[in-house]
Amino acid sequence: MSYQEKNTMPSIMDALVPMVVEQTSRGERSYDIYSRLLKERIIFLTGQVEDHMANLVVAQLLFLESENPDKDIYLYINSPGGSVTAGMSIYDTMQFIKPNVSTVCMGQACSMGAFLLAGGTPGKRHVLPNSRVMIHQPLGGFQGQASDIQIHAQEILTIKQKLNKLLAEHTGQPLEVVERDTDRDNFMSADQAVEYGLVDSVLNHRGQ
């Protein structure tokens, strides 16, 4: 994950979102597939974590809270990670709102994606059996005057300490273990992620 924002261009796949047609008392009504799933309180967090995507996820979390503050929200994650600040806006909103947020990893949850996966409601964090989870320390780069480089270096160290502390709280691992395990890219299988405490269970089929 990076503590600096990376601009990403919308994918051409964004224009290929399937539409769903429903029959209502007022006739047919069409939704894009993600809007239809939002009605079921399902949010998708996919791709690079960046400001635009984070704003959309935060808006959906707040909307679903306003719709029903007592009903769970389901956050499906398939992300390689991204900006720390964008990710933390999602994380803070997850902790702020009243509904429980159940997180599900499908495909991959790496870096900030893994952090958000672990930040779901305890007992309601899941991973699909062939998914991969990866934790590591934040990435960053800066160029400029020596004094400014020193300031940014201290900032990324501060962020590293904060993330490690929160990850220790969510996993139940000692802080020194998290610091050791995030020193380099640390990939885990679904079962290993459960054992580490990043998630609570592996979902092999619906109904578990």
UniProtKB/Swiss-Prot annotation:
The active site is at S111, H136. One of its GO terms (biological process) is protein quality control for misfolded or incompletely synthesized proteins. It is found in: Cytoplasm. Its EC number is 3.4.21.92. InterPro entries: ClpP (IPR001907), ClpP/crotonase-like_dom_sf (IPR029045), ClpP/TepA (IPR023562), ClpP_His_AS (IPR033135), ClpP_Ser_AS (IPR018215). GO terms for molecular function: ATP-dependent peptidase activity; ATPase binding; serine-type endopeptidase activity. Keywords: Cytoplasm, Hydrolase, Protease, Serine protease. It holds the Pfam family CLP_protease. Its main location: cytoplasm. It catalyses: Hydrolysis of proteins to small peptides in the presence of ATP and magnesium. alpha-casein is the usual test substrate. In the absence of ATP, only oligopeptides shorter than five residues are hydrolyzed (such as succinyl-Leu-Tyr-|-NHMec, and Leu-Tyr-Leu-|-Tyr-Trp, in which cleavage of the -Tyr-|-Leu- and -Tyr-|-Trp bonds also occurs). Fourteen ClpP subunits assemble into 2 heptameric rings which stack back to back to give a disk-like structure with a central cavity, resembling the structure of eukaryotic proteasomes. This is ATP-dependent Clp protease proteolytic subunit. The gene is clpP.
